[in-house]
Amino acid sequence: MIHELFKEFSQLEQVEAIALGGSRAGQAYDQNSDYDVYVYLNSPIDEANRLKILSKYCSYMEIGNQFWELEDDCVLNNGIEIELIYRSLESFEQELNSTVFQHQAQNSYTTCMWHNLLHSKILYDPNGHYASLQRTYQIPYPQELKKHIIERQLLLLDQAMPAFSHQIEKAIKRQDLLSMNHRTSEFFASYFDLLFALNEQTHPGEKRMLEYAKTNCTLLPKQFEETIRKYFQLLYQPQQGEQAVVTLQTILKELKAILP
């Protein structure tokens, strides 16, 4: 069934390539794993045409969600969820170039698109454009990019006045739970962006970062997982606020200890 869906999309003139991402692109998936499908376009496909195709294969459809990228979020007739993300191949290429060859660091998730390119499974690529992109970006981690990511994340973590660690300390003192949660999420997004760059690993995205780092990073702070878990155990206990701040400072100290 799923292959027929892919085939119908591949017959549209707007489609230049289709790639499968997420766990389904590798070996770590089971029969219930979702499908993350990236459809690369030279021009938009109108919603009516997408709906016409998807309605044959899906029991539930949300067409045209644009909370992040343009996507259709659906449930296949067999009950498995599928997410179709529509991208301009030209814009995707420009973003990759900006990151990998122009060495532009972001506040977090800097190399996610690069990781997505390298780890996706090609389903349709008649002109070889996507495969060519994979070959172009199958390169050693640029040292200038690594340097820029580390510098930017250190500023965000604790060196700049509005750094996340300072904001967390203020939020803990106020016992502002929502701010504590929000700033902590930003802190660790920045933290892992730095850690993956330090280890010259592309960023796998927001899921299972701790496990991915343990498996793929040779440079890890002392008591890496234990200290992070301790911080979260303390964070939402009002009487443990000071200890949460101390633990956060330990996380920063041990991260800096492994920097070149």
Question: For the regions a protein language model found, what residue spans apply to each?
Answer:
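A generic local structural motif
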Residues: H3-K7, S23-A25, E69
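A short alpha-helix capping/helix-coil boundary motif
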Residues: L5-F6, R50-K52, L145-H148
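Conserved NTP/Mg2+-binding pocket subregion across the NTase superfamily
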Residues: C58-I172
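Conserved nucleotidyltransferase catalytic core and NTase-mimicking acidic/glycine-rich helix/loop elements
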Residues: G128-P260
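Helical scaffold of the NTase/Pol beta-like nucleotidyltransferase catalytic core
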Residues: M1-A19
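Short, solvent-exposed loop/turn segments at secondary-structure junctions
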Residues: A25-G26, L89-E90, Q201-H203
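Catalytic metal-binding acidic patch
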Residues: G21-K56, E71-R87
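Short aromatic-enriched loop/helix-cap "lid" or pocket-rim segments at secondary-structure transitions
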Residues: Q31-S33, E95-S98, M209
